[in-house]
Regions:
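Non-catalytic alpha-helical scaffolds
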Residues: 129-132
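C-terminal lobe/lid and adjacent interdomain/linker elements of RecA-like ASCE P-loop ATPase modules
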Residues: 1-89, 94-118, 135-166
Length: 166
């Protein structure tokens, strides 16, 4: 429904349209709803997949070393790769079962897999605030995007077009 509404208004001038969202809040004694102006995130991307790619693509073009970004990058990479593989092969496999279909070089495949697992799954408190260094993040993002390009260059071009159009 969300994307359908945005498609209806795509052709209108910016100054003749606005988007609003209803946020529900639970309080201790009652539930309330607040109407708020829709943020850019919901109007800039037509899917979470496009948003995740934009994060990887923008990082590849201009790496940032802020901990706020690096902390989430392995999870962003994992979710993007899982979605790509599920879409490409119409299988709902775990990333371990299908990542080698995307990243065919065994060393690079293992490097990306470990990066996505180790830094995005905090199963114990000893891994709670560990960050991958910037060089490792850059290398793995390059591996992922280059692998998508090798496997499906038309799809990657479409993703880049979607990201640069926002």
């Amino acid at each position: 429904f969300h994307n359908l509404v945005f498609d209806w208004f795509k052709g209108l001038k910016k100054d003749t349209k606005d988007y609003w969202i209803i946020e529900r809040h639970k309080n201790s004694h009652k539930d309330e709803s607040v109407i708020k102006q829709n943020g850019n995130l919901l109007t800039s991307f037509n899917s979470e997949y496009a948003y995740l790619f934009s994060l990887l693509h923008n990082f590849q073009a201009s790496p940032t070393d802020t901990y706020e970004f690096l902390y989430h990058l392995p999870n962003v990479a994992r979710r993007f790769v899982e979605t790509f593989l599920n879409f490409k092969y119409l299988e709902r496999n775990k990333i371990d079962e299908s990542i080698d279909k995307l990243i065919t070089n065994p060393v690079e495949c293992e490097r990306a897999r470990k990066f996505m697992h180790y830094y995005s799954h905090n199963l114990t408190t000893d891994k709670f605030m560990k960050f991958a260094d910037l060089a490792e993040c850059q290398a793995v993002v390059d591996i992922i995007i280059n692998s998508v390009n090798t496997l499906d260059p038309i799809h990657l071009t479409s993703l880049k077009t979607t990201v640069t159009a926002t």
